[in-house]
Amino acid sequence: MIRMEEDFTNVDVLNADQLEVGDLIGIGGEIVKVLAIAPLHYGFNLAIENNFGEKDFVDVREDDTFKLYIENF
């Protein structure tokens, strides 16, 4: 089942250093799940998965912020 943005509620805004594995965050206009976090000298490398099951890596700076979402039931 494809989840749409209305299936989620924005509950907070997190700094990059507050992210945890399993968080649902907004990146690039979509809501993705954080699969892994690796520190870099300027920030973090995030392994992410979108709602189509596509996985990717994205580098973020330590001063970047992200909307945190929870699923609506």
Name what the model sees in each region.
Residues 1-20:
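Mixed-charge, Lys/Arg-rich low-complexity intrinsically disordered regions
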Residues 31-60:
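Basic/aromatic-rich interaction segments and small domains that mediate binding to polyanionic partners
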Residues 21-22, 44:
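Short, hydrophobic/aromatic-rich segments at coil-to-beta transitions
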Residues 16, 37, 51, 63, ...:
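Generic structural motif
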Residues 22-25, 66:
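Generic structural signal for buried aliphatic residues
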Residues 2-8, 55-73:
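Intrinsically disordered, low-complexity, charged/polar segments
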